[in-house]
A protein has these predicted regions:
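Catalytic-core "active-site belt" of small-molecule-metabolizing enzymes
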Residues: 1-127
Length: 127
């Protein structure tokens, strides 16, 4: 079946240094509370427990140089530089060695968060 009930977003493609082809971004996996200084900055208890994981939609990704409008209804649109790893092979419960071998490349990513919304929802015990 190829028909869909609504139009699907295009898969974002990012340029790759010294390559004529781009890297398609199908999924974005993120790691939270893996940086103690940032956890302290956010006002949460700094512990050494395992970090937590979450996803972001590649449909919301923009390439470098694109202007991102300040979202209405927020007072604190926060930015963070992130290390981005691009995988060249699928992984599931991989060893550290297999995970390293699956890395296609790396780059920089700018994460934008509506921090006031995040803090308000955290106070309500919401993710």
């Amino acid at each position: 079946m190829t028909d869909t009930l609504f139009e699907l977003p295009a898969i974002p493609v990012v340029p790759v240094l010294n390559e004529s082809a781009g890297y398609p971004v199908g999924r974005i996996f993120c790691v939270g509370r893996n940086y103690a200084a940032h956890a302290a900055e956010m006002g949460v208890e700094v512990d050494r427990e395992a970090p937590f994981y979450f996803t972001k939609s590649p449909a919301n990704m923009v390439l470098s140089g694109v202007e991102v409008p300040y979202p209405p209804g927020t007072d604190n649109f926060h930015y963070e530089m992130e290390l981005a790893l691009a995988l060249g092979a699928p992984l599931f419960r991989a060893s550290a060695e297999a995970a390293r071998a699956a890395i296609y490349g790396f780059g920089c990513a700018l994460d934008m968060t509506r921090r006031d919304l995040q803090i308000r929802e955290r106070k309500k015990q919401r993710p």
